């Protein structure tokens, strides 16, 4: 089987880390459970300058993100059973080294890491093998996807049989699912069970 797995807020607790940082930098104390927007600028009501400053801390923040419980164990089980796992992130490509190091530190050396411009941020270096151009991505096929962002659901429209396991987060609780192939999951244990416990 082939798995698409998003990075932030699926593998690691990025939203919680940015909530703590926004409180520290700007006194914007928004409880994690009240983060109703995927866009950090909207969640914390930041000015453009504050948003830029927040993102300026991204490299150091990314290095220390907590793993979402169970993520690496399930992914390594899939890989060890011969399944293909692609970590497909919407992060800027400038985070590649920090992102790859995080995966390696968490025992995910065999997981492929790709960058896809999911949110219109631009990724540059189009000739890099880790950057997926849209036409490259849309040629890929997957059996299951693990994703938290409703803004990324459009990247699954070309795969009518794809089972999408939506990792429950405050910003996706009011999102409508495009079809019956989407299922909300609250843990990696539940994701594993919904993926048929491959292995």
Q: What do these predicted ranges mean?
A:
Residues 56-87, 91-99:
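Short, acidic loop-to-helix structural element flanking the phosphoryl-transfer center
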Residues 93-146, 150-157:
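Substrate-recognition "cap/lid" segment bordering the active-site pocket of phosphatases
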Residues 105-116, 141, 177-197:
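Structural recognition of alpha->loop->beta junctions
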Residues 144-186:
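Acidic, Mg2+-coordinating phosphoryl-transfer loop and its flanking beta/alpha structural elements
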């Amino acid at each position: 089987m082939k798995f698409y797995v998003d990075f932030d807020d699926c593998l690691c607790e990025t939203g919680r880390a940015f909530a703590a940082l926004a409180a520290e930098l700007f006194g914007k104390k928004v409880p994690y459970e009240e983060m109703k927007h995927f866009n950090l600028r909207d969640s914390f009501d930041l000015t453009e300058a504050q948003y830029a400053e927040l993102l300026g801390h991204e490299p150091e923040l990314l290095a220390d993100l907590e793993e979402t419980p169970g993520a690496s164990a399930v992914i390594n089980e899939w890989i060890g059973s011969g399944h293909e796992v692609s970590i497909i992130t919407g992060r800027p490509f400038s985070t590649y080294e920090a992102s790859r190091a995080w995966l390696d530190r968490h025992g995910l050396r065999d997981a492929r890491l790709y960058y896809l411009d999911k949110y219109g941020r631009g990724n540059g270096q189009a000739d890099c093998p880790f950057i997926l151009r849209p036409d490259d991505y849309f040629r890929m096929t997957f059996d299951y996807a693990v994703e938290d962002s409703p803004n990324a659901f459009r990247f699954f429209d070309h795969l009518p049989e794809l089972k999408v396991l939506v990792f429950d987060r405050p910003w996706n609780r009011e999102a409508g699912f495009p079809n019956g192939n989407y299922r909300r999951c609250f843990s990696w244990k539940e994701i594993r069970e919904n993926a048929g416990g491959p292995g």
